[in-house]
């Protein structure tokens, strides 16, 4: 989309990140904080901010059509101007409604630069933090909200974590975010992960699953939103 000059080993595609936000039914104005605790270079957070501000995809990049004849150029510029007029100017707030954190300081540095490039840096708060530190108390403290949506793309696959390490990570996250197999009250989860064994490792069955591919890796998007439900 033209805003992401900096990436890490296995970056999430911008279009997929935007899809995850939309499929999670998150709205900036409903008071629910969006948190990505393994944000990498910030793609999910940036796409959420672009959606919240109603920024048209590709608005910040150049296109070959801009070099065409005057007739095409006028139509293109008119469309760009219309998109600019529709963009919402959202007030900066503390804490931010969109939060990203990662254990890797260099990833957070890149995420901040990407957010600046996308023009949404005032809408996103970043921190260096281990995702496994986010127990219910820490989530409330970090977000200052009793409604939180966690959307994240944890490391997995050959380029990131081997199967045993990924399994241990998923298990650790489930211990923090689930209670008796169901999501803790006030929290919703949307996690993209390989379809094999995630729910067993995580410690609870998802309330909804969506099949998708992250690059060449067949995954599911696991949605957890029902609290107080007994584990199957």
Give the label of every model feature segment:
Residues 145-153:
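Short SAM/SAH-binding signature in class I
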Residues 134-146:
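Short amphipathic alpha-helix with an adjacent loop that forms part of the alpha/beta core around
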Residues 93-97, 101-110, 158-232:
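Conserved Class I SAM-dependent methyltransferase catalytic core
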Residues 12-136:
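Conserved S-adenosyl-L-methionine
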Residues 1-5:
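Non-catalytic substrate-recognition/targeting regions of SAM-dependent transferases
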Residues 49-53, 114-115, 141, 164-167, ...:
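Short, glycine/charged-enriched secondary-structure capping and boundary segments
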């Amino acid at each position: 989309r033209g805003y992401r000059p900096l990436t890490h080993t296995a970056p999430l595609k911008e279009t997929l990140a935007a899809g995850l936000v939309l499929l999670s039914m998150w709205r900036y104005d409903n008071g629910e904080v969006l948190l990505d605790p393994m944000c990498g270079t910030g793609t999910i957070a940036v796409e959420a901010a672009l959606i919240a501000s109603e920024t048209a995809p590709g608005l910040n990049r150049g296109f070959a059509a801009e070099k065409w004849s005057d007739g095409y150029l006028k139509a293109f510029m008119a469309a760009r101007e219309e998109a600019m007029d529709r963009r919402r100017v959202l007030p900066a707030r503390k804490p931010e409604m969109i939060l990203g954190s990662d254990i890797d300081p260099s990833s957070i540095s890149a995420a901040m630069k990407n957010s600046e490039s996308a023009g949404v840096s005032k809408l996103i708060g970043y921190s260096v933090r281990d995702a496994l530190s986010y127990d219910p108390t820490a989530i409330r403290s970090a977000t200052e909200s009793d409604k939180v949506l966690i959307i994240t793309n944890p490391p997995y696959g050959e380029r990131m974590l081997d199967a045993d390490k990924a399994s241990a990570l998923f298990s650790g996250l489930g211990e923090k975010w689930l209670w008796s197999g169901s999501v803790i009250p006030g929290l919703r989860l949307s996690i993209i992960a390989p379809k094999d064994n995630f729910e067993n490792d995580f410690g609870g069955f998802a309330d909804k699953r969506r099949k998708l591919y992250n690059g060449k890796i067949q995954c599911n998007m696991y949605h957890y939103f029902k609290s107080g439900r007994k584990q199957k």
